[in-house]
């Protein structure tokens, strides 16, 4: 560690052997020394290893069928959307592994374009949850943004770059890892322009936001304020490349079904046409038949639609699907509440009729799967308030009457132990 020469004691780095005169800084530990150059080298090695571990490797990338099977464990129904998402996500990360370029059979270089995803469907049908589950499976950073909070640069509201800040924060400010993450932009139907025809007045929260999103959707080197908010010239920025960020853009698109219905209904003209009633047209899955022209009529600009080539649609959940959502997935609501009651030493049971009644309530309210938890909270609130203070409850049974008629759940008392019986008889 230390060498004694003509000039007295000369300290050396325990790792590279350089003396304190050959390096800028020498840091002492218990019996060891390390120089600034070795510290820099260690940091570089750690960063490289972390970057390698955070990348989605092609040989480890799950196949589309495996992605769909994983989604099946958490999301009930929506099979068409699962297949579409599985293929799109697989191809996206395969493209990243190829470095945006691949070679065809003749050995020529082919540029692989990015395919962002547009998800259509009513609220409470699993759009957000599908995207969250995908990110969880792939172990990539995931951020959710609300399109309604965005405005064009220079106006009151959030800049589109703040979406990227959420992704960087989700990656613990590891920009390299964030550059292969997933961003989910919800309520995108709310930024549709107010009319199909371009307006002379500025639409800062509609068409203006769509225009602002174009660059980051396609892929650009964006400057992100580290603390969020508006940009100003005297602040530092985080630079992030969005070329390999997967964007999943979603919305309920209320009213789009009428546009599709009008277009589909026009086919029923002429002697050889299939004649369908208005009721028959209304009951079919309109979102599965959406064309770019329908989205343009709704209010999305053609350039925005062009950057969302993959379209996945989700459908309204029926009663059977909602009952399955309550009890079957790995983190089903019934399992969650069972665990909460179990922590108080109480068993919780839902009858089949009770689950069906909860599903009926969700359909009646029009909230889909998102409203199931609120109904469960209302039903269980009285017993969740009372039971922690009691030690004489063995079991709580929730029936259809509890859900429909506000009847308290049935409480099964705990059987006293033998010792307790003797004490009472004495």
Curated annotation (Swiss-Prot):
GO terms for molecular function: ATP binding; ATP hydrolysis activity; ATP-dependent protein folding chaperone; protein dimerization activity; unfolded protein binding; zinc ion binding. Keywords: ATP-binding, Chaperone, Metal-binding, Nucleotide-binding, Zinc. InterPro entries: AAA+_ATPase (IPR003593), ATP-dep_Clp_protease_ClpX (IPR050052), ATPase_AAA_core (IPR003959), Clp_ATPase_C (IPR019489), Clp_protease_ATP-bd_su_ClpX (IPR004487), ClpX_bact (IPR046425), P-loop_NTPase (IPR027417), Znf_CppX_C4 (IPR010603). Residues 1-54 form the ClpX-type ZB domain. Zn(2+) binds at residues 13, 16, 35, 38. GO terms for cellular component: HslUV protease complex. ATP-dependent specificity component of the Clp protease. It directs the protease to specific substrates. Can perform chaperone functions in the absence of ClpP. The lineage of its organism: Bacteria, Bacillati, Actinomycetota, Actinomycetes, Mycobacteriales. Belongs to the ClpX chaperone family. It comes from the Bacteria. Gene3D superfamilies: 1.10.8.60, ClpX chaperone, C4-type zinc finger domain, P-loop containing nucleotide triphosphate hydrolases. Component of the ClpX-ClpP complex. Forms a hexameric ring that, in the presence of ATP, binds to fourteen ClpP subunits assembled into a disk-like structure with a central cavity, resembling the structure of eukaryotic proteasomes. This is ATP-dependent Clp protease ATP-binding subunit ClpX. ATP binds at residues 122-129. Transmembrane segments: none annotated. The keyword Transcription does not apply. HAMAP family: ClpX. Pfam families: AAA_2, ClpB_D2-small, zf-C4_ClpX. It comes from Rhodococcus opacus (strain B4). One of its GO terms (biological process) is cell division.
């Amino acid at each position: 560690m230390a060498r004694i020469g003509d000039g007295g004691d000369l300290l050396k780095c325990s790792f590279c052997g350089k003396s304190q005169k050959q390096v800028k800084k020498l840091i002492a530990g218990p019996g060891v020394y390390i120089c600034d150059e070795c510290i820099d080298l260690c940091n570089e090695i750690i960063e490289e290893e972390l970057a390698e571990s955070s990348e989605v490797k092609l040989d480890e990338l799950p196949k589309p069928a495996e992605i769909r099977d994983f989604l099946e464990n958490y999301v009930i129904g929506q099979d068409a959307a699962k297949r579409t998402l599985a293929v799109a996500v697989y191809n996206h990360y395969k493209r990243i592994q190829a470095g945006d370029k691949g070679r065809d059979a003749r050995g020529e270089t082919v540029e692989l374009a990015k395919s962002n995803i547009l998800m259509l469907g009513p609220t409470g049908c699993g759009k957000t949850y599908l995207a969250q589950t995908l990110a969880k499976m792939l172990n990539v950073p995931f951020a959710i943004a609300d399109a309604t909070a965005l405005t064009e640069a220079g106006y009151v509201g959030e800049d589109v770059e703040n979406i990227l800040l959420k992704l960087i924060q989700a990656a613990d400010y590891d920009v390299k890892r964030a550059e292969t993450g997933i961003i989910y932009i919800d309520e995108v139907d709310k930024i549709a322009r107010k009319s199909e025809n371009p307006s002379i007045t500025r639409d800062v929260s509609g068409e203006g936001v769509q225009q602002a999103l174009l660059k980051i959707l396609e892929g650009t080197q964006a400057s992100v304020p580290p603390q969020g908010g508006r940009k100003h010239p005297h602040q530092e920025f985080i630079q992030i490349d969005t070329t390999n960020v997967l964007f999943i853009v979603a919305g309920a698109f209320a009213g789009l079904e009428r546009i599709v219905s009008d277009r589909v209904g026009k086919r029923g003209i002429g002697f050889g046409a299939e004649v369908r009633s208005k009721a028959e047209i209304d009951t079919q899955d309109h979102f599965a038949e959406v064309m770019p022209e329908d989205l343009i009529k709704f209010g999305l600009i053609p350039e925005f639609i062009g950057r969302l080539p993959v379209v996945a649609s989700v459908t309204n959940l029926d009663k059977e699907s909602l009952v399955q959502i309550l009890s079957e997935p790995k983190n089903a609501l019934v399992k969650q509440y069972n665990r909460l009651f179990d922590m108080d030493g109480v068993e919780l049971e839902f009858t089949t009729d009770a689950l069906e009644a909860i599903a009926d309530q969700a359909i009646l309210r029009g909230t889909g799967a998102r409203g199931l938890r609120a109904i469960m909270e209302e039903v269980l609130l009285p017993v969740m308030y009372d039971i922690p203070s009691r030690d004489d409850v063995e079991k709580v049974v929730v029936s259809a009457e509890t859900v429909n008629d506000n009847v308290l759940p049935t409480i099964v008392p705990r059987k006293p132990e033998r010792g307790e019986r003797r004490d009472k008889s004495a």
